Design a protein with these regions (language model features):
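Gram-negative (and chloroplast) outer-membrane scaffold detector with strong preference
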Residues: 21-23, 28, 36-42, 66-140, ...
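Short sequence motifs at beta-strands and strand-loop junctions characteristic
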Residues: 55-61, 100-107, 149-154, 193-197
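Surface-exposed strand-loop-strand hairpins of Gram-negative outer-membrane beta-barrel proteins
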Residues: 38-63, 146, 150-151
């Protein structure tokens, strides 16, 4: 999955260069953002076909990018791509399904952002989004099986604060919650129905142009 970060970097960097060399903009205009963070998949059901089990997970890294448009000083929209990763501690009683492994997802969402105007460089904001899991996969150990799903409906809520470091650069810190419905992980003759909820914190750099 991490190889998919390269096209996003190639897209964001030229936009950032344009932003840094441009004139100061008003309250509306386009933006590009790059994020890194840390988060955890919530423990929950990870049910084999015809049975039930629960999964326990450890935190992992997050990374992502977004292209947005500020309609005015209060409202904006963005297309967001975020990669989330973490470790599997156990699935099933005593790790009967898996006692280690990796669990990761790529989510694509369209977000609506509401900002609270202040007479300072600080910009508190909240947002909500709807989209899908471009990919979610679990590598189960010690069996070595890999199961995955694509296209599951996903929804997102976020809240954060931005600091306007210059006319064209804003630094953001935000918390995010992502949930997904009807995740069905299949592969190598195995099938699972899983809950997927993830909570994380991300640091971002947003270029305004």
């Amino acid at each position: 999955m991490q190889r998919k970060l390269l096209p996003l970097a190639l897209l964001i960097l030229p936009l950032a260069a344009c932003a840094s060399s441009g004139e100061p903009r008003g309250s509306s205009g386009f933006s590009a953002r790059a994020n890194v963070g840390y988060g955890k998949t919530s423990d929950g059901s990870f049910d084999p076909s015809g049975s039930s089990a629960s999964g326990e997970y450890s935190p992992g890294m997050m990374s992502g990018a977004a292209i947005g448009y500020d309609i005015n000083e209060r409202w904006g929209v963005e297309a967001d791509w975020t990669y989330r990763s973490g470790d599997i501690d156990s699935i099933g009683t005593g790790g009967s399904v898996a006692n280690s492994g990796d669990y990761a997802s790529v989510a694509v969402t369209g977000n609506v952002i509401h900002s609270f105007a202040t007479d300072s460089p600080w910009r508190p904001y909240i947002g909500a989004g709807l989209g899908f899991l471009q990919e979610i996969d679990a590598d189960l150990k010690p069996s070595g099986a890999e199961v995955s799903d694509r296209g599951a409906l996903a929804y997102q809520f976020l809240a954060g604060v931005g600091y306007r470091a210059s006319d064209s650069i804003e630094i953001t810190l935000e918390g995010r919650y992502l949930g997904a419905e009807d995740v069905e992980l299949t592969g190598e003759g195995q099938s699972f129905e899983a809950e997927y909820e993830h909570v994380g914190v991300m640091l971002g750099f947003r270029w305004l142009f």
